[in-house]
């Protein structure tokens, strides 16, 4: 589906004002019969930014209120984020009850209802988009575009029931990324030999095989970062990657960079003026 609008905006002004719906009713018909979510964070420096902690606390409250089964995992001390993600993926696949893996990096901030929306969408791989540090107008995810009859490039995707958009992605960022179990299983089927052994990653299981879902790699004289590699290989395995743009996100370093990708694509002059972070659980 091609999403069109004036001045390459993907939504009407009315749709652009729509915020993610708070899915507080666990009996909604779109909810799967069984869901176990693993929320995982690689901590290199053994610390998380305070906005990350605040957002996570509210997510825990919301998922608990909804009766969604979940666990929080952290992996500390690995200086290679791609290796940390692969270690988490391996452990995730060893839990037969786990259905969804949600990576959230320790320098993120988000509104909790958006995370819940992403969990219960049917697509296999969905990422949020957040501002690049030091440049709020640049974003970490790259949508797919196609040329319309008007000669302009338009993002590809579909309109969700709440009036917001879900965009097909060329690249999804790893710092706020939901992956369904079936996506990792299909990756392993497509690339059965793309694994390594790392005894130091888990001394209690020194023979475990770690698939390279994430890695930095040079191909065709291009350097692929770990999330670019993941996105590329998922598409080559026949899977689609998607962006859920309507998340109020912050990306923190020496200071915070905040924005809403939905507002950015809808033509907002400065997405830092998007609605305040909704961290209140009703």
Give names to the regions the model predicted.
Residues 2-24, 29-35, 190-282:
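C-terminal catalytic/acceptor-binding lobe
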Residues 1-79:
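N-proximal low-complexity "stem/linker" segments adjacent to membrane-targeting elements
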Residues 97-109:
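Short beta-strand-to-loop acidic/aromatic patch adjacent to the donor-nucleotide binding site
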Residues 86-100:
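Active-site nucleotide-sugar/metal-binding loop of Leloir-type enzymes
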Residues 89, 111-215:
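Conserved catalytic core of nucleotide-sugar-dependent glycosyltransferases
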Residues 81-85, 227:
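Conserved donor sugar-nucleotide recognition element shared by glycan-biosynthetic enzymes
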Residues 31, 93-94, 119:
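Residue-level signal for alpha-helix termini/capping positions
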Residues 100, 124-125, 241:
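Short, Asp-centered acidic motifs that coordinate Mg2+ and/or phosphate
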């Amino acid at each position: 589906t091609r999403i069109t609008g004036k001045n390459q905006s993907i939504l009407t002004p009315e749709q652009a004002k729509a915020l993610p719906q708070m899915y507080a009713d666990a009996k909604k018909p779109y909810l799967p019969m069984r869901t176990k979510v693993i929320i995982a964070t690689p901590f290199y420096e053994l610390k998380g930014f305070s906005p990350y902690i605040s957002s996570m606390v509210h997510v825990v409250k919301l998922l608990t209120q909804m009766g969604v089964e979940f666990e929080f995992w952290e992996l500390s001390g690995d200086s290679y984020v791609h290796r940390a993600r692969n270690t988490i993926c391996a452990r995730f696949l060893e839990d037969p009850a786990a259905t969804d893996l949600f990576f959230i990096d320790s320098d993120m901030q988000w509104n909790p209802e958006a995370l819940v929306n992403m969990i219960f969408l049917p697509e296999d791989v969905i990422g949020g988009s957040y501002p690049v540090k030091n440049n709020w107008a640049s974003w970490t995810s790259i949508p797919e575009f196609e040329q319309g009859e008007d000669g302009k490039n338009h993002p590809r995707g579909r309109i969700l029931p709440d009036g917001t958009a879900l965009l097909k992605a060329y690249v999804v960022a790893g710092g706020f990324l939901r992956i369904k179990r079936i996506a990792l299983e299909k990756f392993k089927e497509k690339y059965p030999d793309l694994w390594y052994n790392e005894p130091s990653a888990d001394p209690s299981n020194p023979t475990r095989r770690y698939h390279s879902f994430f890695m930095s790699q040079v191909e065709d004289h291009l350097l692929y970062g770990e999330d670019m590699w993941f996105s590329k290989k998922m598409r080559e395995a026949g899977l689609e990657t998607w962006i859920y743009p309507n998340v109020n996100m912050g990306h923190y370093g020496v200071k915070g960079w905040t924005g809403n990708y939905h507002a950015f694509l809808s033509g907002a002059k400065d997405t830092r003026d998007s609605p305040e972070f909704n961290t209140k659980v009703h």
